[in-house]
Amino acid sequence: MDLFEYQAKKLFAEHGVPVPTGKIATTPQQAREIATELGGKVVVKAQVKAGGRGKAGGVKVADGPDDAFEKASAILGMDIKGHTVHSVLVEQASNIAEEYYASFLLDRANRTFLAMASREGGMEIEEVAATNPEALARIHIDPLTGVDAAKAREIAVAAKLPEAAIEGASVLLVKLWEVFVKADATLVEVNPLILTGDGKVIALDGKVTLDENADFRHPENAELVDVAAVDPLEQKAKEKGLNYVKLEGQVGIIGNGAGLVMSTLDVVTYAGEEFGGQRPANFLDIGGGASAEVMANGLSIILSDPSVKSVFVNIFGGITACDAVANGIVQALAIVGDVSTPLVVRLDGNNAEEGRRILKEANLPVVKPVDTMDGAAKLAAELAAAAA
């Protein structure tokens, strides 16, 4: 999960990383009040989870409260790379002498942690890596020892930071590593990391990506979710413990196992070409769970999408037997109630014959059992096209 800048900076401050004083505003009037409280020049910064805010006009310096009101009025509601600006961070302007770059990230290719730092900050780091790769220091971090003062100094020196910034940057890097580890982050980035005119090293910007697999250790992360940016069906599925991603098609998909569901998306897309371009409406992996409750939750979410005209339930029985899935489907339809959208069901594997028998004897008009995956995909696409 990516954090907004203001959320990242709050996390930084909690761990002792120096950041400019600032507050979040959702209206121009709030921006004016914050600027009055801070005094002097302030910076009004669009809060979106996208880069290039400055180039898009989403970062503006204001000379005082009234100017902050005007700048916030111009920024709020802007579209930056497909993201609408709903809030701005109003913070004290900094006296910038030099700009650097620093980050800690999970290096998946080498299965370790990586520190990256550069004397060339304030620009897209990808640009630095492409045009001047020697300016970007890369230091692998031993997860058993982490980043202490000596390691932090090694990173700062490797980045060729000036002597005036080495000590301050080293202290900041140790604290930044603490954020990375304690927050269970996969990325912690400061760009720019600045040296001020009076010799202080400050995180002027902040980017943090949290590992959602570690959410069980961080119940407080629920408060960080950007509800406005999350699809309501995806949020509902997450609350139910379901792995659901909304797509743009008309055929709802339920499967057990990510690989099978991905294959199902492909087969439905191919079959849909024959029926006016019908496509998958979602990705929904129920994993090993085929209980009535899981099925009911899955169907309820999929059928809440008005674009869904048919549902393809594709199950390969393994540890979860097909007869259990069939019973789950029958009970789920009773729980959901009043379902008119056709369900094409393909069962294969463990106890598939028994599963088909259960569906047949249930005599549910909306359930259409099909033996093959290709045949089921074709029927699901055909039914969706007919209902469009």
Curated annotation (Swiss-Prot):
UniProt source species: Parafrankia sp. (strain EAN1pec)
GO biological process terms held by the UniProt record: succinyl-CoA metabolic process; tricarboxylic acid cycle
Top enzyme class: ligase
Function: Succinyl-CoA synthetase functions in the citric acid cycle (TCA), coupling the hydrolysis of succinyl-CoA to the synthesis of either ATP or GTP and thus represents the only step of substrate-level phosphorylation in the TCA. The beta subunit provides nucleotide specificity of the enzyme and binds the substrate succinate, while the binding sites for coenzyme A and phosphate are found in the alpha subunit.
Descriptive protein name: Succinate--CoA ligase [ADP-forming] subunit beta
Annotated binding of substrate, by residue: N256, G318, I319, T320
GO cellular component, one term: succinate-CoA ligase complex
Pfam family, one: ATP-grasp_2
Cofactor remark: Binds 1 Mg(2+) ion per subunit.
